[in-house]
Amino acid sequence: MILKISEIVFDYQGQVRAGWRILYYLLLTGAGSTAFIAAYKAAATSLFPAAAGSVRLGEIAPYALIGAAAILGAFIMLRFFDQRPLKTLGYSMHTRMGIEIAQGILLGFFMISILSGIEWAAGYVSFSRAEGDFGQLPLTFVYYAAVFTASAAMEESLTRGYAFQALVQGIGKAGAVCVSSIAFSLAHLFNPHVNGIALLNTILAGVWLSIAYLKTRSLWLPTSLHMTWNLSLGFIFGYPVSGAIMPDAMTRLSRRGPDWITGGAYGPEGGVLCTGILLAAILFLSRSARIKPAETACSLWHSPGQA
């Protein structure tokens, strides 16, 4: 059977098929990211020379700019292809927004605390206060919170935002979770000290965060989970985060356990203990009645023309 070009591009409802919309979205986001970062570098160099040399601003800016490009790309796609308002992307100000952020912060910190407690009780790690100016700790905390918030918002916009929602519409929830989670893992393929367990755990993290979105129809919960996981892991407890070390973490970590359990130089995300923590979190999110969407989020999702 030979398909017409119109059937390849459009579905039976006359809407551009999900695969094409995702491709357009990624092209828009890529072009926007390139333009925003180039403009930032040019402006910083010519107008704000001190900012151009700021290591800390240089770490936050790319995440924020790529995140902005991802949201702008979503706005264009939603407006001209999906006929949906931008607030259906997942960052709308709704009645459960504060609850979802609080749930993400508490659950993310609890998960890392349990992981750290098990490793400490098993004698695999020990913790001590890091050296340095203790008075700078609050400012350093705020800095890392900003970095990890920008990073989490960027990654969630890209992997649980418009592209994921189009996948849900095109191939269903299960297929969308699988595809996006594998893509999320492959994005970490070249991280320092990565291993097979780390890639598996990153797939599980993608499933975990996808469920957080699907249960709430909002990006507040997955973003706060993602941010708090990284902040707790790297800054508070002093572990490597996906192979990256926080040089001014508040805790000094000494590691002695086997790499296949602790993750070694990659951090806990490269060990089987993290696998168990993530599986438990997936089960909890899937079954918890406390994780639910706001009424406004439900109405937005189920309005005409939506997935």
Task: Label every PLM stretch briefly.
Residues 1-86, 90, 234-307:
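N-terminal, membrane-interfacial amphipathic/helix-forming hydrophobic leader that caps
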Residues 2-6, 40-62, 84-157, 164-169, ...:
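Juxtamembrane helix-loop-helix connectors linking adjacent transmembrane helices
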Residues 22-27, 60-61, 101-106, 141-142, ...:
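Hydrophobic alpha-helical transmembrane segments
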Residues 64-69, 138-145, 158, 200-204, ...:
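Membrane-embedded alpha-helical segments of multi-pass membrane proteins
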Residues 112-113, 148-149, 172-189, 202-203:
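Small-polar-interrupted transmembrane alpha-helices in polytopic inner-membrane proteins
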Residues 130, 187-196:
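Membrane-interface helix caps and helix-loop-helix hairpins in membrane proteins
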Residues 154-179, 211-218:
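Membrane-interface helix/loop boundary segments of multi-pass membrane proteins
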Residues 183-184, 201, 225-230:
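Transmembrane alpha-helical core residues of multi-pass small-molecule transporters
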